[in-house]
């Protein structure tokens, strides 16, 4: 009997202990399962089943899924609010552009493209912007002023030429803008106008700046302007020795205008059949036509204030007014006054009409010097480069001459082109005066001007061999 009594008491104690433990566990589970956001508690989810469900589902993974989504939204907001002056394409810059960017960092001249398209790490290094879906943005200088020339490499030399349609022009600007201004600042040129064919001595030619890159001249060590692509620059143009050393230390491809000319694709039938942009000549129109470039050929303009600017005027672009400062090349007016007496002067620029037309209205309000004006929309867009096809003039090419600081500009009529050194601020420059005797002689001869231009400047000798 004692044994039975003892077993009964032990069994009752065990049952009571189990009930107490179950009550504690159930109470704890109810507290843990209480919803924090006002949700209804799940029914009958206690004990081992509830613990298993908690272990499988849990709340931590849900929080981890929410946090990354929140971080990505913040990142997108930052990217959308980031104001940049250059297009941000999804593709990485090509080899040449990346090298130029490194040189800018070496010289401590990180341009707007670098600063806006890369994030700064805590260690001060730059990394690519993770956002690649932002719409392309264009610069003021790249849309109003003359664009830079794009690298023309063997990889794309067989490409087809574009047209001057609005859609292709926009696409071309997106390509051109990837080079942007810090690239132009790194490239030097050596094109000359000598008669012995030394117009391209060291094959380091600049890729033409958007007219007035908005920086100060190359001759100034502080706030200097970006020299124009393909435009000649004198050895004492103000570049420091450290700058030159950094340039030559890197193994990168420079823009070769004569390689570009050699491999430029032929004009399409549509381009060859474009209607002439100029009206027919009148009886008072001179027999010979002289086509002149604007930027770095006749004038030099900048968005930075120039103390010695000959004039300044505002330009309204995208609801923003920009002040343009203009320097006139020495003997600018004398050259035009003299040449306008024997030539039909035609201004042909790759700049936007909103800028160039306003400048010409100031310089020649009555059109006594320049009879006709052509702008970017009259150029032919070839793989991001604007070329001035003289066929659009509707003039006899045997009596047509073009003067430009960029040989690429007259790539389709090389025998009609006279290269001239780019001008920024040299007050002793007399390149325009030096051309007057030769131009007068061409009119006096009254012959096809192309053989004479070819023999004088020998640009065809600078083309690379086949």
Swiss-Prot record:
One of its GO terms (molecular function) is phosphoprotein phosphatase activity. The keyword Hydrolase applies. Its EC number is 3.1.3.-. The modification N6-acetyllysine is found at residues 26, 57. The modification Phosphothreonine is found at residue 86. The modification Phosphoserine is found at residues 28, 51, 85, 104, 134, 165. GO terms for biological process: negative regulation of BMP signaling pathway; positive regulation of protein export from nucleus; protein export from nucleus. Keywords: Acetylation, Hydrolase, Phosphoprotein, Protein phosphatase. It holds the Pfam family NIF. It comes from the Eukaryota. Residues 1-140, 220-240 are annotated as: Disordered. InterPro entries: Dullard_phosphatase, FCP1_dom, HAD-like_sf, HAD_sf, TIM50. Residues 60-79 have a biased composition (Basic and acidic residues). Residues 283-442 form the FCP1 homology domain. PROSITE patterns: FCP1. The keyword Phosphoprotein applies. GO terms for cellular component: nucleoplasm. Residues 8-20, 129-140 have a biased composition (Polar residues). Probable phosphatase. Belongs to the CTDSPL2 family. PANTHER family: DULLARD PROTEIN PHOSPHATASE (PTHR12210). This is CTD small phosphatase-like protein 2.
């Amino acid at each position: 009997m004692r044994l039975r009594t003892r077993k009964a008491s032990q069994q009752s104690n065990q049952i009571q202990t189990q009930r107490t433990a179950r009550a504690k566990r159930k109470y704890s589970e109810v507290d843990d399962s209480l919803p924090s956001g006002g949700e209804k508690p799940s029914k009958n989810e206690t004990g081992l089943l509830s613990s298993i469900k908690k272990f499988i589902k849990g709340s931590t993974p849900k929080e981890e899924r929410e946090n990354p989504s929140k971080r990505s939204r913040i990142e997108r907001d930052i990217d959308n609010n980031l104001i940049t002056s250059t297009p941000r394409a999804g593709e990485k810059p090509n080899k040449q552009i990346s090298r130029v960017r490194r040189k800018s960092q070496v010289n401590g001249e990180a341009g707007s493209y670098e600063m806006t398209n890369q994030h700064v790490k805590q260690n001060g290094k730059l990394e690519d912007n993770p956002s690649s879906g932002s719409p392309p943005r264009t610069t003021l200088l790249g849309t109003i002023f003359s664009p830079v020339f794009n690298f023309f490499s063997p990889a794309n030399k067989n490409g087809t030429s574009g047209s001057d349609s609005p859609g292709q022009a926009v696409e071309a600007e997106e390509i051109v803008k990837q080079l942007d201004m810090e690239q132009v600042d790194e490239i030097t040129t050596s094109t000359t106008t000598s008669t012995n064919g030394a117009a391209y001595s060291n094959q380091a030619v600049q890729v033409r700046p958007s007219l007035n890159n908005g920086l100060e001249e190359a001759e100034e060590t502080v706030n200097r302007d970006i020299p124009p692509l393909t435009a000649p620059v004198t050895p004492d143009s103000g570049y420091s020795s450290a700058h030159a050393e950094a340039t030559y230390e890197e193994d990168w491809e420079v823009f070769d205008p004569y390689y570009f000319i050699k491999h430029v694709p032929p004009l399409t039938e549509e381009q060859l059949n474009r209607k002439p942009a100029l009206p027919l000549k009148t009886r008072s129109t001179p027999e010979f036509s002289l086509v002149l470039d604007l930027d770095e050929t006749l004038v030099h303009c900048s968005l930075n204030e120039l103390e010695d600017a000959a004039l300044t005027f505002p330009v309204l672009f995208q609801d923003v007014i920009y002040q343009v400062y203009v320097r006139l090349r020495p003997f600018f007016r004398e050259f035009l006054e003299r040449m306008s007496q024997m030539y039909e002067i035609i201004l042909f620029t790759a700049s936007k009409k909103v800028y160039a037309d306003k400048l010409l209205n100031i310089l020649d309000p009555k059109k006594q010097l320049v009879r006709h004006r052509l702008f970017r929309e009259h150029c032919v867009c070839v793989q991001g480069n604007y070329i001035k096809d003289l066929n659009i003039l509707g003039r006899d090419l045997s009596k047509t001459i073009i003067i430009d600081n960029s040989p690429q500009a007259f790539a389709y009529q090389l025998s009609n082109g006279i290269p001239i050194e780019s001008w920024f601020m040299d007050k002793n420059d007399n390149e325009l005066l030096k051309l007057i005797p030769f131009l007068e002689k061409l009119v006096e001869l009254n012959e096809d001007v192309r053989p004479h231009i070819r023999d004088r400047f020998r640009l065809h000798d600078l083309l690379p061999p086949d």
